[in-house]
Structure formats: C-alpha cells, structure tokens
Amino acid sequence: MEARPPKGPGKQFTFDYENEVHKRDYFIKSPPPQLFFSGTSWKKRLFILSQSRGTGLSLSYYKDHQHRGSIEIDGSSTVEVGINCQEKMQSVQKMFKCHPDEVMSIRTANRDYFLIGHDREKIKDWVSFMTPYCQGVKATHQRAEEKLSLGDRRPVSDPSPFLGLCSIPEGIRLASPRASLPEHLIQKSLQRFRQAHLHQDHDFHSEPTQDTEEEYYLTPRSLEACLELENIAGPNDSGDSIESNSPDQGFKRAESNYVSMRSLRTCLLKESTSASADDNDGQAEFQTESELGPPHQDSGTGSDPCLSPPNSKAQTTDDQKGSASLTVVKLSILLNNIPDESQVETLNVFLSPRDAIDYLALVEAAGQICVARWEGPPRLGCLFYHGDHILAVNDLKPQSLEEVSLFLTRCIQKEKVKLSIGRIPNSEKLHASPCACSLRHQLAESVQRDLPELERTPKRSPAIKKSQKEAAGE
C-alpha cells in the first residue's frame, strides 16, 4: 500500500505504511527519456523504499506532500551504480558536476530511472540493498544453468574433474554456429586442446590455460572471416562496378550487403511522410541525426535508396556534388577561416517543424551546430549555404544537437518555426537533390547556346570593357 501523507499543512510530515519501510532519502530523479538531456527537467524528490505486497520492493517518490509515483523493483529489474551509456553519463556529469559513483541506475520493464545523490557510500548502500530483490530465486537458477552450460562448452577453464573430453566437439559447434570450418582444422585444434589439458591436471588457473584457450578460440574466428569473404566475393555480385583486381574488393562487397541503421531509419521516416511530400522526394536520401563522416549517395535511379551503393564514384556531376553532405572537416575549415566574426550575417529562416525535422541534417563542427545537408522539395528551394550554423530556434539558443531536436519537437504543433542562421559571406549555396536551380542553369545555358554569335556579344561586352578600362588605368 502506498503512503498516505497528511492533508494538513506543516513543515514536518509523517507517512503511514502498512508495509515495512527500509530506507528514505532525497535524490535527483531523471525525466522521461525524451527529456533526458534537458537539465531543468531533472527534479529533486523524496524517495521512500518499502516492502511491496509480493517479494519485491516499492520505491515511492514525493514532491512536498504529494505522491508523484512509484518504481516497482522485482526479479525483472536491475539496479547498478553509474550509467552504462557513456554519452548519457557524460551528459549527467556535465549538467550536475557529479561523480559516476554518485549515480544509481534502475532499469524496469517499462522505463529506466537514474537517481543522483551526493554520497557515494549512500548510493552503494542503496544498490547493495536492492540488488538481492532484483535477482531473487530466478537469478540463482539462471547462474546454475549458466555454470553447467559453461562447463559443457569450455572444459579447460572449469576445474571439475568429472568433465571429460567427449563433449568437446559439441562445444565447438555451439561456439561456432556457422559450422563452416574444414574438418581437419577442427581436429587439429582438438589435438592441441587435449595436449594442453593433459599438462593441467592439478593447476587449472595457470597462465598457459589462458594462452591455449585464446589460441583455440581465435583461430577458427579468423578462418571463418576469410571463408566468409571468399563466399561474399563470389559471382552473385552482379552489377558491381569495382574492378576484380582491387585489393579491397571483398571488403566493399561485404559492406554493400548490409543496410546501415541510418538508411533504414531514413526509409521508415520517408514512408511516414510520403503522403504530404512531392513525388520527387522519394529519391532523396536525407539525414535525421548528425553523424561524423559523409553519408551514402544514391548510385542510380533504379537502385534502392536505402542501400549503400558499391561504387561511390558514379554520377559525379556538379549538382550531385552540391547535394552531398558537408563533412565535419570541411565545415570546420570554413568556420575557422572566417577573417572577421562581425562579417557573419544573421538571418531568419521560417520552416514548418515537420520540414525542419524531415529534410534538415545538422552536425557539430568547430563548436557550432552546422547545416550538413538539406533535402527539401523543390517548392521550398535551396535555403542554406555552406557553413550555415544554427544560432537559435524560436529565439532559444541550443547548446547541443539534442537541444535542437528537443526545441523542434516541442513546437511540432505550430505552423512555423524560426531558425536563426549565421551565414558566412560569399559562401557557396547548398543544393538539394531535387533542386530546381540546376534546371534553371541548364535552361539558361541552352538559350545562350541557341542565340547567334552577334546577339551573344553584347552580353559579354561589359566584362570586356571593364578589362579594357583596367588596362588603360595601368
């Protein structure tokens, strides 16, 4: 049963429990996952750990006199000190200036919670108290099963004298599910394995055990990699434009058989926005998350835009060069070579939140949040230039890519969002793939070609006159 705080006012208040109360203390609680990187969303709460009706624990938290929620800790939960995700841990340290040992992670079936304290010993004490309730009888049986399974597969590291060598071939099949190694290699490895086992009748934890074990497992792994590369580089790769004499042919072909997670997410987002997008947007591959390095380009109109092309040198026209993503190195060079910061122009770009989320890709470079790629439809045009960096989103200055995403998500219901852009003078325009600028340029060139020579001469005369005047002035 949850705590029932009193209704009357007062500085001191007590809680009535039917179950036993084990611990109570104040912690800073993490917000929902979508607001994790927002420091103002973390709140200080009073936590009370009590016995639940079952075999687990109930961790209730309160704001002043009000019960705000509870965390059920049972056999399916995990409690540990610190945060496994390095990115999240670094963000928490930056926001709260705390040590990793002052953070407690609680993972349940529905959500992950992170609690920040200011006493390492207190955090360790809480984790030590809750851990047995997370493991319970289920974890005991699981450890026993894992021990038996480990004994069947790896008899070298198990000092049990009852384990024989008859189960070794089965263990090899378990550790190597592909079963693509030749039989003579397996027998050779088994022979070395038996010889090492005979020298370790009384000392099972000596250093030779680790060396033999490492050699036994690493050898099949490297051979399997070679066999897989030979199978991948077979005749099935039709349409691959890489020459057969290329030394990295097998690596490139192996890489082309996989779909990157970024491209897969791009496809899912395209399907969800295809109802409101133009027909030409189907061939454009846009970025939703900033990542280091250039993205994959479409190799042709008949290929799947979600697959990485095997040859990135195809179709290197000027328009495709303009539509490619700007790398972190190129953006850093542009920003570091600005002669005067006062020359950077500040302007506002108004977009719908959905267009900004779907078609705009950002990346961090030289301490700025820069525009790396723009894949908007032709109706929007080419709005950005090389080196454009985000100064504010609806007059809110973001400090990271996560805050930009958070600001855009919060105004998703609004009609327009204002992006304050810093623009480098005389920078090159960043074209999109379905860009209309290239069509206008081609049309102007064709009209210029069709005109007679006499009609084209006056258009070039101003430049000629300018050069003559300069020559006369010299």
UniProtKB/Swiss-Prot annotation:
PROSITE patterns: PH_DOMAIN
Signal peptide, first to last residue: none
Disordered as annotated region, ranges: 232-251, 272-321, 449-474
Encoding gene per record: Plekhs1
Segments forming domain PH: 20-135
Protein name (database record): Pleckstrin homology domain-containing family S member 1
Compositional bias (Polar residues): 238-248
Composition bias type Basic and acidic residues, residue spans: 449-458
